[in-house]
Every structure is written in structure tokens, then in C-alpha cells.
Regions:
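Short helix/loop capping segments that flank catalytic or ligand/cofactor-binding pockets
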Residues: 9-12, 80-82
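Surface-exposed beta-strand edges and their flanking turn/coil or helix-capping segments
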Residues: 11-16, 121
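Conserved catalytic core of two-metal-ion nucleotidyltransferases
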Residues: 1-9
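E2/UBC-UEV (E2-variant) core
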Residues: 16-32
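Conserved nucleotidyltransferase catalytic core and NTase-mimicking acidic/glycine-rich helix/loop elements
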Residues: 35-162
Length: 162
């Protein structure tokens, strides 16, 4: 009896898609100036502070790639915050001939038929808009501090301050 030791095989299309998607971040990041790369890091800290950074399904937040795309389109942290503070429902960031039905449309800089904004919840988008407006009214280093964990805040009745 002959037993094949070959692993499960997939059409080459999947490999191509994997390489293509992995390469997107590198291609966008390579187009950013050093100043813009610094602004990507600043934007990520800002989003972490308001607890909307993260691409996990449960988080429904802004991925690292989305932050890179926003800086790519707007050019700097300051311009991104200004544009986000003025954001309207259904507004399109980037250029695409395809129509999308979501609260915010952020066109993938590499694939203009892909909306990066579909995974972002309306609540997280709203937090970003409101935090951007607050930052513009009163810029502060406090917008970049690590957030206090909800787990810690939930147990504040058990904390003793000396």
C-alpha cells in the first residue's frame, strides 16, 4: 500500500495573495519620509492612549497599517489630527473608483479597491474624532501617556494609597 507523505496543497493564488499582502506595509512604509515615519509612531501612541489602536476583531480599532496609510495620505501627525477632527460619515480618504458603504472609507494606498476602514467600529472612530478635536483645542503630552487599564480601574476599591 502506498501512502503519500505530501502535505496539503493550496492553489498558488493563495501564496501570491499572502506575499502581496505582506509586502503592502513594506511598500507604503518605504514611501514615507523619516519625519513621516516618526509621525506614524506618534499617531500610534495617540491611538493607544485613547484605546482604539489594534487590529484584533474584538478591538475593532486602527491597525498599524491604517496609521501608516493615514500619515501617507495626510503627510503628518498634525494634518492627520486636523483632518480626522473634521471627518464626516462616509468620507473617503484616498482615491478609488469603487464605492464603499461604511462610516469611514480609508483606501489602501497599494490596492485602491480595498477599504481599510471596514474593520473600525463607529465607537472607535468617534473616539478618534473627539480626541482629535480635544487635542487641537488643548495640545498636551497627556494624549500620549499609557492608558490606565480597565482591569486596574475595576479593582480601585482594593488599592491602598500611602
Amino acid at each position: 500500500m502506498f501512502v503519500s507523505a505530501l502535505p496539503e496543497c493550496f492553489p498558488i493564488q493563495y501564496l501570491y495573495d499572502y506575499v502581496k499582502s505582506k509586502d503592502k506595509t513594506e511598500r507604503v512604509y518605504a514611501q514615507l519620509s523619516n519625519s513621516m515615519k516618526g509621525d506614524v509612531r506618534i499617531l500610534k501612541k495617540f491611538l493607544q492612549h485613547i484605546e482604539v489602536y489594534g487590529a484584533e476583531i474584538a478591538k475593532e480599532g486602527f491597525s498599524g497599517y491604517v496609521t501608516e496609510a493615514l500619515i501617507f495620505y495626510f503627510g503628518s501627525f498634525e494634518k492627520t489630527i486636523k483632518k480626522i477632527s473634521e471627518l464626516k460619515k462616509g468620507q473617503v480618504i484616498g482615491k478609488s473608483t469603487k464605492k464603499f458603504d461604511s462610516f469611514v472609507v480609508i483606501i489602501d494606498p497599494i490596492d485602491n479597491n480595498r477599504n481599510l476602514g471596514t474593520a473600525i467600529s463607529i465607537e472607535n472612530l468617534g473616539k478618534f474624532v473627539l480626541a482629535s478635536r480635544a487635542f487641537l483645542r488643548n495640545p498636551s503630552k497627556n494624549f500620549f501617556k499609557k492608558p490606565i487599564s480597565k482591569r486596574i480601574m475595576k479593582n480601585t476599591d482594593k488599592i491602598i494609597v500611602v
